[in-house]
């Protein structure tokens, strides 16, 4: 290839598998970061977001054949893995000389398997991708070998699979350019009429819950962007795209209390009137902090409940107590913030009794909304190892790993029972008369969506009774 200074790069967000209840599209932040670093290095970047643009495999084939590409990189979670690989097969067929790459959480822990399963795949970029990606682009231009590129697993000249050591994490996240939103199909990313812009202000997590693959992807060290850098990005997207609401995608936004306070102060100083929400742990909020957040535009907090059973919380390695959860919800409500509960059902050790405790506990907390997720064994997590070791896995098709459908069963809980429990959990939560009234009074995006959901469950309940 010799010295080409500008490589043509196509980055792809794969479509959901056909069987999956498709979510409203989210901005693919990982690709937007890769696009930004590649553009900064002088390359041409195109992002194809199959979810936002509702592209089928056939439509993708047409699209990719119109884009000159030296490099085709596809991102994938476990749920999107097969879909991603189908796109890589297609891309390789149309551009046989292009280098194909897989990135994201699934490839990170399934790297050698992916290269073995799909000859059309050339390189897996593991863990954090920005530095690795730029280094690969440099190597491709100078025709050097990839032997010294940290953080990749690849097919070498002899066709053998080589796994290079991990790349150390990026310590100073402020060096990263802001995500390249201009490369995204923003018009197709609207939800209820507006684009919800996500920001990630930290990477890594000090806690290591057994069901979580994110921490294993981004490490134990909690790395933070500076308050100024965070608010610079908020101001930029506000000015450039007229955005008035953002959402923080950090695993736990309030790990460092002082930084959150500084972000809030910075927002006040710049008179940035933005609404925002964030997710965090129940043991990392207090009244003062929540008030400070509220006064700086925070409208909602996602607080990880996970379970209403101390036994299961212990098994998850979650390290919280139910009283901490109670206090966090009570305080958030008193301060006037909306709350959304994240709950995991069916973690190994779950029984009908512990699941019942959890459902009752969630009703007691009375959050404004809830997500009941089925414990799903993602490769790379201790939970996955445990499920495999005990021979509990029943579903090996990754297209079914959507956190709505159970994939394994334990002696204490069958797949059928777990599916039924999850449905009941939602039904009981949304059909409480007090809940519907509260949401009707609230109005706004959250209120309307909650009332619609309740109505859907009511209709299904009636239908079941009638049929």
Tell me the role of every PLM-derived stretch.
Residues 26, 174, 178-347, 351, ...:
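Radical SAM [4Fe-4S] cluster-binding motif and immediate context
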Residues 18-20, 111, 157, 207, ...:
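Flexible glycine/acidic-rich beta-alpha junction loops that bind and position SAM and/or redox cofactors
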Residues 8, 24, 37-172, 376, ...:
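Glycine-rich beta-alpha loop elements in corrinoid/cobalamin-binding modules
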Residues 2-6, 11, 44, 61, ...:
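Radical SAM enzyme core and accessory elements
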Residues 111-117, 289, 349-363:
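Catalytic cores of alpha/beta
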Residues 129, 290-308, 368-377, 397:
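Non-cysteine beta-strand/loop elements that form the S-adenosyl-L-methionine
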Residues 68-69, 243, 367:
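Proline-aspartate-enriched helix->loop->beta-strand connector
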Residues 7-10, 15-18, 146-149, 155-201:
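N-terminal [4Fe-4S]-dependent radical SAM core
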